[in-house]
Amino acid sequence: MVQIVISSARAGGLAEWVLMELQGEIEARYSTGLAGNLLGDLHYTTEGIPVLIVGHHILYGKIIHLEKPFAVLVKHTPGDQDCDELGRETGTRYLVTALIKDKILFKTRPKPIITSVPKKV
């Protein structure tokens, strides 16, 4: 099971992110890995159903509200550029940067997108 965190825009306060849960495994085409690369396009239908397009495949999902939200933490250790207001270094601290309250679940197999198949005459 692959879990990917993406950011969604929100005005003021902490950022609110959405967790995407996919069944199976996603492999990068090249050995560079997936970090920092575009995975696909996320769209919503007029009914609010999430649709993920990855390459020549399409996945339909559903939005699930999490019972207990997740917090996204950033670890700051002494020696980092960020020190507290007095300029003194303290122990390791964690900064909450975002909350995850919802997830998008894609539990069905991806369907291939076929535009048109030419017929041989």
UniProtKB/Swiss-Prot annotation:
Listed GO CC annotations: Ctf18 RFC-like complex; nucleoplasm
Subunit structure: Component of the CTF18-RFC complex, which consists of CTF18, CTF8, DSCC1, RFC2, RFC3, RFC4 and RFC5. The CTF18-RFC complex does not interact with the Rad9/Rad1/Hus1 complex. The CTF18-RFC complex interacts with POLH. CTF18/CTF8/DSCC1 associate with PCNA. CTF8 exists as a dimer with DSCC1.
Name under which the protein is recorded: Chromosome transmission fidelity protein 8 homolog
Keyword Zinc in record: no
Gene behind this protein: CHTF8
Keywords assigned: Cell cycle, DNA replication, DNA-binding, Nucleus
Subcellular localization: Nucleus
Main location: nucleus
One term of GO molecular function: DNA binding
One Pfam family hit: Ctf8
Protein family per UniProt: Belongs to the CTF8 family.
Domain of life: Eukaryota
Function of the protein: Chromosome cohesion factor involved in sister chromatid cohesion and fidelity of chromosome transmission. Component of one of the cell nuclear antigen loader complexes, CTF18-replication factor C (CTF18-RFC), which consists of CTF18, CTF8, DSCC1, RFC2, RFC3, RFC4 and RFC5. The CTF18-RFC complex binds to single-stranded and primed DNAs and has weak ATPase activity that is stimulated the presence of primed DNA, replication protein A (RPA) and proliferating cell nuclear antigen (PCNA). The CTF18-RFC complex catalyzes the ATP-dependent loading of PCNA onto primed and gapped DNA.
Alphabetical list of InterPro entries matching this protein: Ctf8
PANTHER family in the record: CHROMOSOME TRANSMISSION FIDELITY PROTEIN 8 HOMOLOG, CTF8, CHROMOSOME TRANSMISSION FIDELITY FACTOR 8 HOMOLOG (S. CEREVISIAE)
GO aspect biological process, one term: mitotic sister chromatid cohesion
Organism in which the protein naturally occurs: Homo sapiens
Keyword DNA-binding annotated: yes
